[in-house]
Regions:
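Short hydrophobic/aromatic-rich beta-strand segments that constitute the beta-sheet cores
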Residues: 86, 124, 166, 219, ...
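A short hydrophobic beta-strand segment most commonly corresponding to one strand
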Residues: 103-104, 117-134, 237-238, 251-267
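Conserved short histidine dyad/triad with adjacent acidic residue
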Residues: 35-44, 51-71, 94-96, 103-109, ...
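Short, Lys/Arg- and Gly-enriched loop/turn segments at beta-strand edges
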Residues: 109-116, 228, 244-250
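A short beta-strand-loop-beta hairpin characteristic of the jelly-roll/cupin
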Residues: 70, 76-97, 203, 209-232
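A short, N-terminal "cap"/entry segment at the start of jelly-roll beta-barrel domains
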Residues: 1-54, 135-192
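Beta-strand-enriched cores of mature, soluble protein domains
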Residues: 31-32, 73, 92-94, 100, ...
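A sequence-level detector of short linear motifs
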Residues: 15-16, 95, 165-166, 229, ...
């Protein structure tokens, strides 16, 4: 994971490392922590979510693109697939790849030349003007986990038997190429880094959209015991809020961007 701040200068763009707030966890986590919240035996945990105005996605045709902003305010853009190159005037170009994120002001993106390569897919969050805030720190890049081939994009849901199952998640990119999806409301978002850990069978408790930015996560479903492996640029929407749930196995320092949605606003 690499996080940057992009600012426009007269004939160039300035690219600087950006500190972000993130929860760090290492080792195993008791499954009862989640089971008790899902059953109501203990109160829901405070997720310390950061507010977001919206989230949206886009797939880009290879070549130039002029609608990277399409709004106002502070925007956090995440590269899911392919590559995205930014250039201002005669200044040097900067290319972002899966696992890269950049914060920018929408008003500064209009004159920047944007070029997409290799079936580029993006997710963009409208963040608060004061994000990332005083608690932000520079993050380590995490354990490299380059993906080969298409991204693994799944959702895990609870079946009628109270067991969890995977299915494909095409709703992430619902629109034609070069067209942003409709802005979607979310409760908020946060970053987490989990290093080398395990959680036994547990429900997710919340609707949690996870974008993996480093490391490797194995998630095993309780319904058919299928194991899906998520690496940099992969996505899993966990919506098995109750029931038996799933197992998590984390390998390496795994950075994840987590988006939390209400039931009525889920994909």
């Amino acid at each position: 994971m690499q996080v940057f701040q992009i600012t426009k200068q007269q004939d160039a763009i300035s690219v600087s490392p950006l500190p972000v707030p993130s929860l760090y966890r290492k080792g195993d986590v008791p499954a009862e922590y989640y089971r008790d919240q899902a059953s109501g035996a203990s109160p829901r945990a405070d997720l310390n979510l950061k507010p977001a105005r919206f989230v949206r996605t886009i797939r880009l045709k290879d070549g130039g693109f002029t609608g990277l902003a399409g709004g106002t305010g502070a925007l956090l853009t995440v590269v899911i697939t392919g590559a995205l190159t930014l250039r201002n005037g005669a200044g040097p170009a900067t290319t972002f790849v899966p696992g890269d994120l950049f914060l920018s002001q929408a008003e500064e993106l209009g004159d920047i030349t944007v070029t997409a390569q290799e079936d580029c897919g993006l997710l963009q969050i409208g963040v608060a003007a004061d994000w990332p805030g005083a608690e932000a720190t520079l993050q380590s890049p995490g354990t490299p986990s380059p993906r080969t081939g298409a991204p693994n994009i799944k959702r895990v849901y609870k079946g009628d038997d109270d067991l969890a199952y995977f299915r494909e998640f095409p709703e992430v990119f619902p629109t034609p190429e070069n067209s942003w999806s409709e802005p979607r409301s979310i409760r908020g978002f946060r970053f987490m880094c989990w290093e080398d850990g395990f959680i036994d069978w547990h429900p997710e408790v919340i609707n949690c959209f996870g974008m993996f930015l480093s490391g490797q996560m194995e998630i095993e479903s309780s319904g058919d015991h299928k194991v899906e492996i998520f690496r940099t640029g992969d996505i899993c929407l966990a919506e098995d809020r109750t029931g038996v749930g799933h197992i998590d196995r984390c390998h390496g320092a795994t950075h994840v961007l987590l988006l939390v949605s209400e039931d009525e606003a889920i994909w």
